[in-house]
Amino acid sequence: MRRRLLYIASIVLLLVACESYDCTLYNHVGCYGAFYQDSASVSLDDTLTITAGKSGPVLLNKSVGTSKIDLSLSYWQDEDTLVLTVKGTDYLVQDTIWISKSNQVHYESPDCPATLFHTIQGVRSTHEFIDSINVIRSSVNYEQTNNLQIHLFSAAD
């Protein structure tokens, strides 16, 4: 009887100790950025659209009041091209951002598909409305923290 109780208790403890990992909740790899002007965080008053390249898919469509962005990076390319289009009532301006990166395969568990983490190696832009871009965190993974500080030209420029 004692042996049977020990066996049942060990089975119960084993079942309780198992962790259920839901892959769909925790597997978004995103490159996060925030807009700054004159060293202060700002929101864009006008409409922002972001596409992957000139004729690529739309990553962000007609967003208004945008202060932060979540960019999906490509899986195997060493450099991604993103076109940011800002449209106001009487103007339209585009700036292109190139993000050079390395890609690392990341394996979480047998139940989850492999994902790719990235390491940002450099960022440049065409400087149409973006003054500069600082990489504040080069590692792009599951953590939802800012990777890029996108500095816009000051209002006086």
Residue ranges and their predicted role:
Residues L44-V93:
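Tryptophan-paired
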Residues M1-C18:
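Sec-dependent bacterial lipoprotein signal peptides
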Residues S10-V12, H28, V123-S125:
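Short N-terminal leader segment in a subset of presequences, especially plant chloroplast
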Residues T24, S39-L44:
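A short beta-turn/strand-edge loop motif at beta-sheet boundaries
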Residues L15-Y36:
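Bacterial Sec-dependent N-terminal signal peptides
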Residues R2, L6, G30-A34, E79-L82, ...:
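N-terminal, helix-rich and Lys/Arg-enriched segments in bacterial and organellar proteins
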Residues C18-L25, S72-D157:
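Extracytoplasmic cysteine-anchoring/structural motifs
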Residues S20, F35-Q37, V58, D70-L71:
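Intrinsically disordered, low-complexity segments enriched in polar/charged residues with Gly/Pro
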